[in-house]
């Protein structure tokens, strides 16, 4: 069974959170989008750091999103307060614990799959929907089809449960960003 099939129910749940609906419909405001990017910075920093340490990004030098998320965040920065949601803090701690565990560190690929494949697919819709508030550099990919294929090549059969964990954290974060809903 593919990761897509294993996570299909959670992917649907993530897409149907109120926050995701706001993103996908273009009804998200600048402040909410900025705070979303702020939370993604914490998550992508951990995922990409552990992926780089293990060489998973060597064949995909254009895949890391951290710099482009930061550029989009700074474009919107007005000096007002942003916060990390409880789910983001929990997820960040989880990623660091997992990434530091020699027995489990390879599972970071499941989180790369959840976040980065989502950016390569659904992110293209989001880019159009946030164009009124952001340039959306985060969603700009060189050679996206090749990146999708390369990500698929590094995925292994033992990632199903961990991919579900990644989606569960994504759902929690989006619910936190919209007041727990």
Language-model features, listed with the residues they occupy:
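Metal- and O2-centered redox machinery and metal/ROS homeostasis
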Residues: 1-181
């Amino acid at each position: 069974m593919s990761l897509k099939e294993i996570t299909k129910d959670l992917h649907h749940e993530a897409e149907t959170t109120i926050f995701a609906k706001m993103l996908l419909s273009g009804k998200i405001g600048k402040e909410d989008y900025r705070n979303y990017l702020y939370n993604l910075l914490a998550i992508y920093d951990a995922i990409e750091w552990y992926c780089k340490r293990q060489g998973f990004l060597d064949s995909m030098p254009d895949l890391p999103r951290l710099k482009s998320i930061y550029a989009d965040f700074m474009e919107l920065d007005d000096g007002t307060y942003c916060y990390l949601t409880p789910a983001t803090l929990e997820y960040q701690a989880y990623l660091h614990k997992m990434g530091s565990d020699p027995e489990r560190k390879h599972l970071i690929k499941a989180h790369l799959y959840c976040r980065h494949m989502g950016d390569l697919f659904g992110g293209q819709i989001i880019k159009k929907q946030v164009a009124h508030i952001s340039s959306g550099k985060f969603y700009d990919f060189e050679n996206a089809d090749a990146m999708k294929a390369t990500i698929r090549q590094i995925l292994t059969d033992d990632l199903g449960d961990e991919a579900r964990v990644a989606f569960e954290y994504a759902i929690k974060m989006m619910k936190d960003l919209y007041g727990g809903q």
